[in-house]
Amino acid sequence: MGYFEQKFLQLQKQKQGAFVPFVTLCDPNFDRSFEIICTLVDNGADALELGFPFSDPLLDGSVIQAANHRALNAGCSTKESFQLIAKVRSKYPDIPISLLLCANLIYAQTLDGFYQRCAEVGVDAVLVADIPLLASEPYIQSAQKYDIQPVFICPPNADETTLKAVAEKSKGYIYLVSRAGVTSAENQQSAKNLANLIKGLKKYGSAPILQGFGIAQPQQVKDVLKSGVAGAISGSAIVQIIEQNLTDREKCLSELAEFVQKMKQATLL
């Protein structure tokens, strides 16, 4: 049983949902990023979703794009990102870790080379954001070869065929997108058909569902959990705290700690 399955079972027994923060690795630099990730875990994060710095993050809003640029400007590439994950895994042997990234970063190292490195540093799951389901088989095969769980996005406009495919292919968890468009904490309008999507995924025996995009407040976490998903992912709101406190390390960490505590508190069912 993988770390994600173990965590979801544990939370279920404790009558809690999962709170999963997203950050870009090495934002604003390697050492600060490690401190930030430690702060997230120490204050209640149930799992981590981590992004690799990339120069053209098409799926991200301006907040995450800025995080990518800060990390790249600090001289952090894929090599440093893997080193940072290894450091996190060494400190937190049981925290589920997933990666969210674009296919180009994987191709630069070959499929097997990338997933092998993921296994070496302790990654549990990988979500390749820009690979359509129809083209996903080589990724799935390579991931499974190294015991990495392939994760897929369920888009807000998913039809029955897509729901079935996502439920069958996605392991560890499913990333349910709250709404169409780019990520941003400002835009908090949920897709109207979320309830049907959740029902459809569960009908096909899906992995636990984590809902993301635009989740920035504790009340949203409560609402998300009421809809039947296993937890919430928050990215832009966290990265915004980092961005607003680039010159004040202590304030950055204390604000992140407070934010995660509030969001985690909202997962108590």
Swiss-Prot record:
Classification lineage: Bacteria, Pseudomonadati, Pseudomonadota, Gammaproteobacteria, Pasteurellales
Residues passing through the membrane, by range: none
Gene Ontology molecular function, alphabetical: tryptophan synthase activity
Assigned GO CC terms: cytosol
Subunit field text: Tetramer of two alpha and two beta chains.
Name by which UniProt lists this protein: Tryptophan synthase alpha chain
Domain of life: Bacteria
EC code(s) of this entry: 4.2.1.20
Protein source organism: Histophilus somni (strain 2336)
Catalyzed reactions: (1S,2R)-1-C-(indol-3-yl)glycerol 3-phosphate + L-serine = D-glyceraldehyde 3-phosphate + L-tryptophan + H2O
Coiled-coil spans in chain: none
Pathway annotation: Amino-acid biosynthesis; L-tryptophan biosynthesis; L-tryptophan from chorismate: step 5/5
InterPro entries: Aldolase_TIM (IPR013785), RibuloseP-bd_barrel (IPR011060), Trp_synthase_alpha_AS (IPR018204), Trp_synthase_suA (IPR002028)
Gene3D superfamilies per the UniProt record, alphabetical: Aldolase class I (3.20.20.70)
Record's function text: The alpha subunit is responsible for the aldol cleavage of indoleglycerol phosphate to indole and glyceraldehyde 3-phosphate.
